[in-house]
Amino acid sequence: MPPNGGKLHNIIINKNQSIMAKYELGAIYKINGRSGELYYVRLLTNDCYGVFSSLEGELNEETFAQTHYRLYFSCNSFPIKRGIWEKVVSSPNCTDIARWQRPQYLANFANFNMKLFLDQCRVFHEDGNLYQCESKEEFIRLVKSGKILFCFNTYEIIPDFLMRYYKDFPNSYIVNKDFIHSGTLEYQKEQTNVLKELGFDIGNLL
C-alpha cells in the first residue's frame, strides 16, 4: 500500500524498452560461434571470462564445476547486460568474490610479435595492473599452459577469435604459421627462435 493512504499511480512500461540484465559474478553465458559452434564462459572478477573446455554432461553447475577453463579473455560487460550472450546457468553465489577470482597472474602475450612479448615478460595481476613477471621461466610456463589474458575492446570479434584458436589452444595460438611465415627473414627467424625457447619442435611444426 502507498504511504499515508496515498493513491497508486499508473505505471506505464514500454515493452520495447531495453532492460539491463544483472551483472552476475560466477554466472555462465553462451557465446554463439560463426558456424554454429557454442562456447560457454563464466564471468570472473575484473571483467575476466573463463572459456570452458569441451563439456561432458548436462548444462548445470555440477558439470561446469568439473570442467577446466581452456583460455581467458577480458571484455566489458555490455554483451551480458544487454543479453547478447545468453545466461545458461545462474551463479551459485554472486557475492562470493574469492570463489570467482580470476587467476592471480595471466601472461601478456601475443602471437604477432612473440619475441617482443617474451623479452618484456609482463603479466596481468588480478588487481588489473601490468607487472614484470618474477622470471622468464615462470612466464613461459604461463604461456605454454594457456594462462594468457586476451583483452578485447569490443565483443563482436570474440566469436571469430574463438573459432580460430579455441581448438587445440594454446598451441593453435602460439604456432600461428600466418605470422611466422610473414614479414622479413629477420622477423621470421626471431619468431622461430621464440618457439624453440618455448620448447616447441620446429621441425614438426613448420
Model-derived segments and their meaning:
Residues 1-3:
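Intrinsically disordered, low-complexity segments enriched in serine/proline and basic residues
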Residues 78-206:
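Beta-strand-rich cores of mature extracytoplasmic or soluble domains
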Residues 61-89:
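Intrinsically disordered, low-complexity linker and terminal regions at domain boundaries
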Residues 8:
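Cationic, low-complexity basic patches in intrinsically disordered or flexible, solvent-exposed regions
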Residues 12-68, 72:
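Short N-terminal edge-element motif at the start of the domain
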